Amino acid sequence: MTHVEVVATIAPQLSIEETLIQKINHRIDAIDVLELRIDQIENVTVDQVAEMITKLKVMQDSFKLLVTYRTKLQGGYGQFINDLYLNLISDLANINGIDMIDIEWQADIDIEKHQRIIKHLQQYNKEVVISHHNFESTPPLDELQFIFFKMQKFNPEYVKLAVMPHNKNDVLNLLQAMSTFSDTMDCKVVGISMSKLGLISRTAQGVFGGALTYGCIGEPQAPGQIDVTDLKAQVTLY
């Protein structure tokens, strides 16, 4: 069983308000990583992100900061695609205070560009979470394993795969794929079976070799997320 860090996802509209800081402080003991989603901000700029990071730095000794721009293609709000998306991700490396950066994987990506950007982020001491999301279904077990394998070839610190289950076998396949990957590969793995049906993948993440589990502060930012306070309590049971 692996040690699991609890990620709290926030998605402020334009800035970090005092009420949000209070909500974070109220849950500070449950948070290992704070994920700042920025895809909900239309035409977001690096300067806007830097300003938000500055406000969060006050509490940063308590947790690591992960920045994520989730595109519409993978279930987010982000309109940036191709070079616009990759340029934003690359430019995030210049912001002090960011510890981790999410970069999406698709089967048709430009491999050389992705490799170059991931190395660039790592040169600036940012941990890379390479991720893939399927909000429609859960692929067969062999395809899940293949996606994990393809993502780890970029040598990230974390590989993350989130899929939507339609039955309990979908959940079991995701957990098996994650467990097998954890036993055979060096980088850390995250596997999420979304919605209430897949909740066990969030609460028992460490049992199957996972390193991160994602929760929310108040309103869920993804199907199946629960409040980080409850999530932390569940994770520590295992």
Curated annotation (Swiss-Prot):
Annotated binding of 3-dehydroquinate, by residue: 35-37, 70, 202, 225
Keywords noted in UniProt: Amino-acid biosynthesis, Aromatic amino acid biosynthesis, Lyase, Schiff base
EC number: 4.2.1.10
Top-level EC class: lyase
Pathway: Metabolic intermediate biosynthesis; chorismate biosynthesis; chorismate from D-erythrose 4-phosphate and phosphoenolpyruvate: step 3/7
Catalytic function, reaction form: 3-dehydroquinate = 3-dehydroshikimate + H2O
A Pfam family per the record: DHquinase_I
Keyword Repeat attached: no
Family in the record: Belongs to the type-I 3-dehydroquinase family.
HAMAP family recorded: AroD
Name of this chain's protein: 3-dehydroquinate dehydratase
